[in-house]
């Protein structure tokens, strides 16, 4: 009744040492992120990009990755984010985009989300603002760069084509209707 990924006694870390010998680095994260795109603080937050395609920005307030809800895309992008900082950005119309992205399961995914948001905003784990500039200030990113990023992201939604990273049309969303939200990823 026990799973073992290696024969007993062979999990000694030799592969990690060999990787370091040829110049590899070791992540200084709280836990090995593997393929899961959430931080320790947001591991239970249902609006992480694992569940829905949202705008992802780095510490410069710029979009930096394909946000499709597929763990390897998100994890690779997040682990390579400048300054080890990234945010998932969305607006108050998230139920509409969730329904568009997941027509068969959106009701289940949205269950309890409003109450969860209230709790996480109160705890400081999720930021919210009625303005893009106010959200940028809370996130600590340059407001002008962030506003430009949001404007470009919204334009791609209107065009129905992601010309930057190729996110599928049905997975596109926009950041247009206040309040706006930022979740650390």
Task: Report residues per predicted region.
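A short acidic, glycine-rich active-site loop
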Residues: 2-10
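A glycine-rich dinucleotide-binding beta-alpha-beta segment and adjacent secondary-structure elements
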Residues: 145-185
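Anion (oxyanion) recognition and catalysis
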Residues: 20
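Extended, hydrophobic alpha-helical segments in both membrane/secreted and soluble proteins
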Residues: 11-15
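A short, structure-level motif marking secondary-structure boundaries and short turns
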Residues: 2, 116-118, 146
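Structural core of flavin- and non-heme-iron oxidoreductases
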Residues: 23-30, 178, 183
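An anion/pyrophosphate-binding glycine-rich loop and adjacent beta-alpha core
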Residues: 16, 25-139
């Amino acid at each position: 009744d026990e799973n073992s990924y290696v024969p007993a006694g062979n999990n000694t870390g030799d592969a990690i040492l060999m990787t370091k010998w040829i110049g590899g680095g070791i992540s200084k994260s709280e836990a090995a992120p593997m393929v899961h795109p959430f931080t320790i603080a947001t591991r239970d937050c249902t609006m992480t990009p694992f569940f829905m395609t949202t705008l992802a920005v780095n510490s410069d307030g710029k979009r930096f990755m394909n946000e499709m809800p597929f763990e390897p895309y998100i994890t690779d992008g997040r682990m390579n984010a400048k300054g080890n900082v990234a945010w998932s950005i969305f607006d108050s119309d998230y139920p509409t985009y969730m329904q568009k992205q997941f027509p068969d399961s959106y009701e289940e995914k949205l269950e309890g989300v409003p109450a969860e948001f209230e709790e996480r905003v109160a705890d400081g784990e999720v930021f919210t603002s009625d303005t893009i500039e106010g959200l940028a200030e809370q996130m600590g990113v340059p407001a002008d760069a962030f506003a430009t990023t949001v404007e470009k992201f919204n334009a791609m939604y209107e065009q129905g084509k992601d010309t930057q990273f190729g996110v599928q049309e049905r997975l596109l969303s926009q950041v247009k209707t206040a309040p706006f939200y930022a979740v650390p990823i």
